[in-house]
Amino acid sequence: AKYKNHPKETNEKRIKNHLNRAFNREQPMETLVSDLTYVKVGGTWHYICLFIDLFNREIVGYSAGKNKDANLVSKAISRINHNLEQIKLFHTDRGKEFDNHLIDEVLETFKIKRSLSTKGCPYDNAVAEATMKAMKTEFVKQMQFENLEQLETELFDYVNWYNNFRPHSSLQYLTPVAFKNLHMKTV
């Protein structure tokens, strides 16, 4: 897989960084972080959007598509198989694809507070950035995608593997699902 620099427009709204690099959370689905990346598919650039639960680093929503836009983000949101009312905070970088009426409507409907990274500071969204880096290393670089359907199928398999079989050092070397299950037993 090949990569290239994609300069992006930024969201200039005056929204604070409410997350403020507090990446450890006490409850599942309390705080989600998100980011997008690009991947070569059959000679053209396509995009992947991930939503990650900070509690256990689980990928709870994902999508792939030809365009880096709000539709890609909303498709990832629609795949979240949890009660969205649990989410208190949604944090992203300042990418324009997250600044959209549809996304605003979802956040407002479920009373989810928006948080944005400081402009030009990837450390403010470090968990999402690290997850994307792992995905590129473990998944994207290992594959050659012929079409969007193949990317979507392989992404589904990767997310399943990532959540259920890949141990995380930040989770005492448990998988995201095992960590959450252990927490649910002790609560």
Give the label of every model feature segment.
Residues 21, 25-60, 66-67:
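An active-site-proximal beta-strand-loop segment
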Residues 1-27, 121, 175-183:
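Basic, flexible linker segments flanking DNA-binding modules
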Residues 108-112, 136-187:
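C-terminal domain-tail junction helix/linker
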Residues 8-10, 92-103, 114-136, 149-156, ...:
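RNase H-like two-metal-ion nuclease catalytic core shared by retroviral integrases
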Residues 56-62, 115-117, 141-142:
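Short small-residue beta-strand/loop micro-motif enriched in glycine and branched aliphatics
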Residues 44, 62-84:
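Active-site beta-loop-alpha junctions of metal-dependent nucleic acid enzymes
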Residues 19, 35, 51, 57, ...:
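Mobile genetic element proteins and their domesticated derivatives, centered on retroelements
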